[in-house]
Design a protein with these regions (language model features):
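Cytosolic regulatory regions built on CNB/CRP/Popeye-like sensor folds
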Residues: 1-156
């Protein structure tokens, strides 16, 4: 059973009231992803977002000019967010999530997640701010990769 206490271990939900967490817990279901499998792939329609319970998941993008994917971030800490595109229009995953180890995650339906955010603007804003922080960090990582690639290219 997914409990408010389990959700509270995630930075996304930490510090929120138990009654609000209980409503999110009711939406969640556990999923497993075997090592080497994709939780989702870049460009696929996004309808879910995930919270990591255990294992290791790499978030990767596949630039068309490269033959191999670039890893943006490797997630291995309880509570980390995977697949924020699942509740954010235009609802297509902007990266792939590849399980590097057998992994267990909580899955949330993106539309239902959004409805709960809208029901309580104060806590919904708190969660959205935390998600924006995740997105911002990942964009900074990608920006650093691009700049490093361009700088390296200019030296050659």
């Amino acid at each position: 059973m997914i409990t408010p206490q389990l959700l509270a271990q995630s930075p996304l939900f930490a510090g929120l009231p138990d009654d609000y967490l209980a409503r999110f817990a009711a939406l969640a279901h556990e999923v497993t992803c075997e090592a080497g499998n994709a939780l989702f792939r870049e460009g696929e329609e996004a309808s879910r977002l995930y919270i990591l319970l255990s294992g290791k998941v790499s978030v990767q993008v596949q630039p068309t000019a490269l033959t191999h994917p670039l890893t943006i971030v490797s997630l291995s800490t309880l509570g980390q967010l995977v697949g924020w595109s699942g509740f954010m229009p235009p609802n297509y995953y902007t990266a792939s999530a590849i399980c590097q180890e057998d992994s267990h995650l909580l899955a949330f339906d993106g539309a239902a997640f959004n409805r709960l955010l809208e029901e309580n603007h104060e806590w919904g804003f708190t969660i959205m701010r935390r998600i924006a922080g995740v997105i911002s960090q990942r964009l900074r990582t990608i920006q650093g990769m691009v700049l490093k690639t361009l700088y390296h290219h200019d030296e050659q």
